[in-house]
UniProtKB/Swiss-Prot annotation:
Pfam families for the chain: ARD (PF03079)
Keywords assigned by UniProt, alphabetized: Cytoplasm, Nucleus
The protein's name: Probable inactive acireductone dioxygenase 2
Function (record text): Probable inactive acireductone dioxygenase.
Gene Ontology MF terms: acireductone dioxygenase [iron(II)-requiring] activity
Stored CDD domains: cupin_ARD
Keyword check for Manganese: no
Location within or outside the cell: Cytoplasm; Nucleus
Family: Belongs to the acireductone dioxygenase (ARD) family.
InterPro entries: ARD (IPR004313), ARD_euk (IPR027496), RmlC-like_jellyroll (IPR014710), RmlC_Cupin_sf (IPR011051)
Length: 181
């Protein structure tokens, strides 16, 4: 991703364009799946993922100026670099956006999330989110147990979740047991 201060909703490709393979995201601890967003209520693959990973809570949110109260403030908060002490799981049912994640060299990688894409960011990973220029995403948020909404804005390197992430992923070059599709 480039270092431009232009509109955060733009793709921000480096020149020349550089695309990151799913294997690289997997090495950073990121999981991803392509699912059927048009029939998510009956999707057996989604049910299996939720059961296997213990995602017992879910809700759906629309992020757009017309539907999200305090839209501008929330978009600004989403784009503030932060980590969470639990996984961040998002399933795009409609629309699109970008998750920006830090690699092992502390450089940004921009991950496009589109309809049908499910992404899991590991606890302790610094990241941020923005919509793209379409200004709309309908996302399913999943949690293990009761939802924890607390973002810890950078720097919070002292938190156990961050220390574990750095030790497991950054210092060891990735989690080879991670499955990304």
């Amino acid at each position: 991703m480039d270092d431009s201060e232009e509109d955060q909703r733009l793709p921000h490709h480096r020149e020349p364009k550089e695309f990151i393979p799913l294997d690289k995201l997997s090495e950073l601890g990121i999981l991803s799946w392509r699912l059927n967003a048009d029939d998510w209520e009956n999707d057996e693959k989604l049910k299996k993922i939720r059961e296997a990973r213990g995602y017992s809570y879910m809700d759906i949110c629309d992020v757009c100026p017309e539907k999200l109260p305090n839209y501008e403030a929330k978009i600004k908060n989403f784009f503030e670099e932060h980590l969470r002490t639990d996984e961040e799981i998002r399933y795009c049912l409609e629309g699109s956006g970008y998750f920006d994640v830090r690699d092992e060299n502390d450089q940004w990688i921009r991950v496009a999330v589109k309809k049908g894409g499910m992404i899991v960011l590991p606890a302790g990973m610094y990241h941020r989110f923005t919509l793209d220029t379409d200004n709309y995403i309908k996302a399913m948020r999943l949690f293990v147990g009761e939802p924890v909404w607390t973002p810890y804005n950078r720097p919070h390197d002292h938190l156990p979740a961050r220390k574990e992430y750095v030790e497991k992923i950054i210092n060891r070059g990735g989690n080879q047991a991670v499955e990304a599709r």
